[in-house]
Amino acid sequence: MLKMESTQQMVSSIINTSFEAAVVAATSTLELMGIQYDYNEVFTRVKSKFDYVMDDSGVKNNLLGKAITIAQALNGKFGSAIRNRNWMSDSKTVAKLDEDVNKLRMTLSSKGIDQKMRVLNACFSVKRIPGKSSSIIKCTRLMKDKIERGEVEVDDSYVDEKMEIDTIDWKSRYDQLEKRFESLKQRVNEKYNTWVQKAKKVNENMYSLQNVISQQQNQIADLQQYCNKLEADLQGKFSSLVSSVEWYLRSMELPDDVKTDIEQQLNSIDLINPINAIDDIESLIRNLIQDYDRTFLMLKGLLKQCNYEYAYE
């Protein structure tokens, strides 16, 4: 004869195996997603949720109850099986219905719809009366069956409680709201006035900055005008210098090729850009000094060949 405890132990083993499978599925999913996890934390969280859902949904008790029914049937006690003849058809249909019901119960439990809410919704329904604010509470067939089976109790503590009617002092409420409104209005006005003062200060700073910028722009314009005038004066001076040197060069008794060479150097001076003009004049002066140095060395050599001596006075 099969003991009832053996059947219940088999069901408990199946439930524990389902829990282990849930833990493995959770950790495997986290690993596939590349998420780091603490195994002990995952185990604790899954166990807490699993135990709550299995207990609150009634799935655990349902499976254990069916195990007891099966054990009693195997031991020759068919009372439980006979009581369930109204919903039994065949093992496949019953298994499918049980699976769907258990799945629904666990889904509702995981969404926060606990056993109390599910039982009350299954036992009662509300019917609205058209044109009235009241309604009729209707008992379902499940409630009727529970009454017949003696599964309904009356809690007198709720009946004896007296309903307290609160008297609302609307004037006091209005005064409180008015004070809150005035306080809020004052804070808004203070913030607005502060904002206005800040805006005025910002405008003053902006106008002051604009005046400074305007003054600096005027100074820059004056400096630009002075630089333009100075550049024009330098261009005129360099042009006069070149003309004066050319005139003086033509009055010298130098060979024509020497005059031509010097004139070419004078004409190469950049009269538009004063900086370049200074560089060109420096180059011209260096060339003249170099030519003078070469001429002096030639004269010195000739004097030595002629046995003459020279001296500066």
Swiss-Prot record:
Pfam families: Rota_NSP3. GO terms for biological process: regulation of translation. Keywords: Coiled coil, Host cytoplasm, Host-virus interaction, RNA-binding, Translation regulation. Residues 1-149 are annotated as: RNA-binding. Residues 208-313 are annotated as: Interaction with host EIF4G1. Homodimer. Interacts (via the coiled-coil region) with host ZC3H7B (via LD motif). Interacts with host EIF4G1. Plays an important role in stimulating the translation of viral mRNAs. These mRNAs are capped but not polyadenylated, instead terminating in a conserved sequence 'GACC' at the 3' that is recognized by NSP3, which competes with host PABPC1 for EIF4G1 binding. The interaction between NSP3 and host EIF4G1 stabilizes the EIF4E-EIF4G1 interaction, thereby facilitating the initiation of capped mRNA translation. Belongs to the rotavirus NSP3 family. This is Non-structural protein 3. The lineage of its organism: Viruses, Riboviria, Orthornavirae, Duplornaviricota, Resentoviricetes.
